[in-house]
């Protein structure tokens, strides 16, 4: 599982948070994400399911987990480069939770893979 973000060359890419070969139960913390624009007041999250073993990949729209409206909004403009904290947990049932925090605002997003309800 990954989420979209801008790389150091200002290109929107997918940054993988959970890799295919990770253990089933996962807890990871990331502090290398930041706001992209000067005066930003929120961050939108687009999640992707893929089998790549690369940390960063090009966006493939067919892999986006559609129908989501995930964001955190802190309501006041912040400088470009303001840190975002991302925490990812996957439990033994396979449920993935992403926690995000910036400027005191927090969000929790549950990712369910398409087709999991038929397993």
Task: Write out the residue ranges for each language-model feature.
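Acidic low-complexity intrinsically disordered segments
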Residues: 1-119
